[in-house]
């Protein structure tokens, strides 16, 4: 994988979302090693960003200490942007996040992104364990975003409460969401917006429209900048890709059933694992999941870009075999995807 061709800068930017999956029969340490290997591969292929999610108390996901993992990935790469997709701000004090990301930005200048979400990223009991009180939560999200952003300002050095490491640092802040709430807030604040269409497809188009229509230019952006997150399982043949995708189906099936399991190996027939209602629920969640060979994917993903008009796509690939996962991103990077042409 050392001589992979770089993706052309003429094409639409592609980025990676990594949940750091723990594989059945493997360890958490294996998951961390695989993530660093994937990040290095993505960098060599010309991907723009490598973001890590925040999830807690989930048997198949190791991305809980997001800031720590960002440092691990940034330290093992040299050019790719590394960030959070995202930090679930209700779980944290804004000051602590400012200190963490200010530290990261000093260690890895002009390479750190800060994506912020308002969901807990876990169940209610675990959310309570994280916060320890009910005084702060999703209702405080707009105020907490603004407080966090203030810590990055140079003039905050005159404040009685400071995040010294963060002051004056260039840390792009993104708002992440799966509904119109974050879209509207991102528009009002003039921030870039990423939509979680990889698991919550229903409000993708309405949220993008709201974001663009309500966008107010800021010192950060003159015009809206949107990103959609999708699932991609690419392989050399359509048949192989659909086989590999059964690990993704099993992962989402376990989520809706409340079953705590690591990522499972692919299977020959999913009908042995789900009933009709479960299949419908999973496939609805995975509406924006693209599976197939390079030829199949180019057509389908380009159509998605034409429909959504997003400026960038971020890709999650829930693939059990690590080498197959690397190959999936290699195939994706080879596609000549371009910014969408409006459908008339």
Predicted regions mapped to residue ranges:
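N-terminal beta1-alpha1-beta2 module of alpha/beta enzyme domains
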Residues: 1-77, 343
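Short, acidic/polar
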Residues: 29-41, 178-184, 296-303
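Conserved, mostly hydrophobic/aromatic
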Residues: 14, 42, 46, 54, ...
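Hydrophobic faces of well-ordered beta-strands that scaffold small-molecule active sites
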Residues: 14-18, 50-52, 82-84, 112-116, ...
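An alpha-helical appendage that flanks or caps ligand/catalytic pockets
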Residues: 3-8, 134-162, 203-309, 337-343
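Flexible, glycine-rich active-site loops centered on histidine and acidic residues
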Residues: 9-28, 90-153, 193
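A conserved active-site cap/scaffold subdomain adjacent to cofactor or substrate pockets
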Residues: 183-202, 208
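Active-site mouth loops of central-metabolism enzymes
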Residues: 18-33, 87-94, 167-177, 285-294
